[in-house]
Amino acid sequence: MSEIFDAKAFLKTVTSQPGVYRMYDAGGTVIYVGKAKDLKKRLSSYFRSNLASRKTEALVAQIQHIDVTVTHTETEALLLEHNYIKLYQPRYNVLLRDDKSYPFIFLSGDTHPRLAMHRGAKHAKGEYFGPFPNGYAVRETLALLQKIFPIRQCENSVYRNRSRPCLQYQIGRCLGPCVAGLVSEEEYAQQVEYVRLFLSGKDDQVLTQLIARMEKASQDLAFEEAARIRDQIQAVRRVTERQFVSNAGDDLDVIGVAFDAGMACVHVLFIRQGKVLGSRSYFPKVPGGTELGEVVETFVGQFYLQGSQMRTLPGEILLDFNLSDKTLLADSLSELAGRRIHVQTKPRGDRARYLKLARTNAATALITKLSQQSTITQRLTALAAVLKLPAIKRMECFDISHTMGEQTVASCVVFDANGPLRAEYRRYNIAGITPGDDYAAMNQVLRRRYGKAIEESKIPDVILIDGGKGQLAQAKAVFAELDVPWDKHHPLLLGVAKGADRKAGLETLFFEPEGEGFSLPPDSPALHVIQHIRDESHDHAIGGHRKKRAKVKNTSTLETIEGVGPKRRQMLLKYMGGLQGLRNASVEEIAKVPGISQGLAEKIFWSLKH
């Protein structure tokens, strides 16, 4: 029992109603959140002499204070518990690391509907199909749909400003509804209906309608039309032949679990209309001593009861582990969805086959993850030995990217004991410096990153500075001047200079800006982890710089031409079919645009050419 917490006095004040409790340590940090049907009974169990696990013993030893929130029902307690877990991220709770909303395919409600990927709240008028496991699955499906059913995927701003068709029309990936006369309203509406049926899992209806149209076209001697429809039929069949489809045609999520060496993998199959849309593996953060039942129960609750997950509920959830609160979970999900949600643990037939697939995928993903973690752990241990540190729990690396001093972007990437922590990667737009001054850029990003209060768990053990002695000197100067509440001497600053011809394995490392550096053998695990984080930082910086450069390039060209305001820009883009069409136009063609004189056309022409 905690020596700094009077459990007896506290328990006298606790009610026997349902609710949620939050446990705090001496620093005022929430270390655990839990729910209970009977708060008094549940909280009393923490302060018995014979505790169930070492994890609970370690938790209780750190309790300084407990807050209790009483709720009307168990369902309210369950929802509030997961909201608090998401808010506080307590270290003794099982935590779902990835809380992104899932993407959908969106079919807009416009006169000429468009297909697009959508995340977040569903405010726009139209139909939503999904969810898909990730953005890649959506983009792959959109590319496939574009080949089979050529309806538009362009933004409305582009669609409304076209006077001639784009490249997608030329290569047969769009029917060109933006230009009058290219496609009839009936034909476009028919293709949209095919997409709607296809995404709803009604492939047979699509094929039946296409075959009927092909036969009619043949009877009418419209052989080119019949051949085009035949190609559509073949494309649809090729897609459906590759897909295992359940005869039931239901919407369900299938959750398989694997647990080994203190690490858990939860694999989710997303099945809609009987089709597997995709799958995804999750590796929740599991405190030591946690039982598998708690991992599954907490994961399922967080997965469906936090934020956007509530809008993607299927009709049925299959689990390969029996939950103690299965009925409570099903009732809570049903209440949220406004319809009955079933939670099953012993399926048969196709459902059993799906569950076996999810379980196998979870086991395979866990084996791969453990292997990767073993490699990362070995590398971090080797680097800690080289740097004479007891351990490395967190590393951060910085890099600068620009083109001739323009659009400068700094990147910060983060590694923890499991490798890249991509959710904490950051980019910083650098401004107010002399173009091309990498030292000033590094100085600015380090001040912005570290010149403020930082949680103790997020103070890095090692900070890598990509660039060698000069950049390391800037980092040392920044840290010498910092006035912060955390120990600014704790992070070890390490400069990394690229080798001759930037060849991997020839890097030189520096502890101090003055004096000689040192190198590690090319086969050193310590060097490999340095190369890994350095390359991640480099790629992250370049990616941000390219996006910034592309944005400037695409928006500033016309804006810099004197005499071309917003209305003339819009008119030019509309009549020329976009910026590329305008670049390819002659002076005479530009002069034909309403409101553009011969002199202004020449100015526009030469500005775009040079």
UniProtKB/Swiss-Prot annotation:
One of its GO terms (molecular function) is DNA binding. Residues 16-94 form the GIY-YIG domain. GO terms for cellular component: cytoplasm; excinuclease repair complex. Residues 204-239 form the UVR domain. PROSITE patterns: GIY_YIG, UVR, UVRC. Keywords: Cytoplasm, DNA damage, DNA excision, DNA repair, Excision nuclease, SOS response. The keyword DNA repair applies. It comes from the Bacteria. It is found in: Cytoplasm. One of its GO terms (biological process) is SOS response. Interacts with UvrB in an incision complex. The UvrABC repair system catalyzes the recognition and processing of DNA lesions. UvrC both incises the 5' and 3' sides of the lesion. The N-terminal half is responsible for the 3' incision and the C-terminal half is responsible for the 5' incision. Belongs to the UvrC family. This is UvrABC system protein C. It comes from Salmonella agona (strain SL483).
